[in-house]
Amino acid sequence: NSYKTAIDAFNAENNGKIALGGFEMTWSGGPGHINTFNTEGIVSRNNTALNNKTDDAGLKAYYALLSQPEGVDSLSQFNHPGSTFGTFSDFSYWDALIDSRMYMVEVGNGEGAIGAGGYYPSYEYYTMALDKGWHVAPTNNQDNHKGKWGNANDARDVILTDDFSEQGIYEAIRSHRMYATEDKNLEIYYTVNEQPLGSILEEIPEELSLSVQVSDPDRTDSISKVEVIVNSGRVAYAWDDPAELASGLLSCTLDPTYSYYYIRVTEGDGDMAVTAPVWVGETLKLGISSVVCGTSTPVTDEELTITTTLFNSESADATVKSVNYTSGGETLGVDAAGNTIPASGSLQIPF
């Protein structure tokens, strides 16, 4: 078809740029938007079956379409998750086959300057997708509607490959060799037990040896903190010593307690970057969906209710031993009632 032919012709020129062909499937007012790359053709959001928003029927139909043998070479991305465009029903409907078609999730989106209006970070949904079992790498894209293709702001996707070609880039994405950054020239290389970011350690080792190389060539930029993030967004380890950070060579050893480990880098000006995880063993698909305050405008010294929603996508019930609420390092309260989250269900705990 004409669009594939145009891409092939552009890439054949070998001019230092690579074109990747794809399309966006959208559900206006529905579960979300998805980019799909490397297919023989495209589909329309006006397709009656695919656009059916009743009980997410259209999203489920799209997952089924991608899961067909013809979709084996396709790569898809969860676009700008959040309250505006949708969270894919909090990343529901996971199964191993569709997981093998979804490779990325946006942690930032928009044409505005980083930290200003028109730029929409969504880092918490990256963690949610990982907690729900999806094997995805982070991206930070511009969603350009007004030109400035690629240079509207400093957000970048970084794909690690030694094969700078269309298929070489796709293979790197399939291996999740990626990180997303708000600083256009921040460099990160991350390994666990000498396996690079995006790897899956199927057998759980006795310990995890993490190594992080991080640098920014700009003299005005500095690294203020580097963290290891694990299930439910917990910080498992952090480096914040200025001298150690300035060396750009960081390492630590951790117990293999969690299902995934990714790196979060924060610069002195607030710019942030996150890497693809290294997964360890089988992902435990349970965690926190949301923490919501019942009062829209809280007032000091007035009582309010905080509701924590927990999910369990496993095939067996899960017991919550306790839920701890803290603020500024101070414990506000502990719910130790021993609640049970049903299999393939959720539980709300008010506090």
Regions found by a protein language model. Give the residues of each.
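Short acidic/proline- and small/hydrophobic-mixed sequence motifs that coincide with surface turns
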Residues: 221-224, 298-299, 315-320
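Short beta-strand elements bearing conserved aromatic residues within extracellular beta-rich modules
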Residues: 225-228, 321-325
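Extracellular recognition modules
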Residues: 262-266, 309, 350
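Asparagine-centered strand-capping/turn motif at beta-strand->loop junctions
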Residues: 310-314
